[in-house]
């Protein structure tokens, strides 16, 4: 984890707490899912000035917190939630999806022609972007599909219109004094790390119900795709 953190922060800067919208603006766009920040960077470079917006999906959400990536004005927001909801969320999507690393649910026929893969991800019939990283076919598909005709407001699992990301160890430690004082004063009495990968089985709402019931004097930290069960909830703030 230390090596991954070092590589990401030295390349893209230290993550900053960031609000991320779930609204998709009208016009051509591309959805990028997976974990590979380098692929996202290359796509942002190749789409700059082409009138195409980029939206993260799933574990690509933290990209919005990195200063180097945030500088791209067409990195607009996040679309959808976790991996197990791909078939529902991508159904008839008027945009292509780039899968970088990890989870790919078998595409439905309604969007199979919009699936593009790269690196270790592949699927029969899907266009695979090789190591040259020429995203021209993906860009052309986005322009062909055209996106939504009007802005579309989406929400998280619990109806929230935005999510937050970027509360990494550096961000927390930069406010260590404030946190310690809040603990001493009793403003913060609990820390909960709600972490883990999610699954597709219906009724898996333990994470959501747990977080909803955490007391107001608690801090909730999260890891992995289980966060989409509750990261759109407004839990308020402690001391700003």
PLM region spans:
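Metallocofactor- and cofactor-centric catalytic cores in central/energy metabolism, strongly enriched
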Residues: 1-240
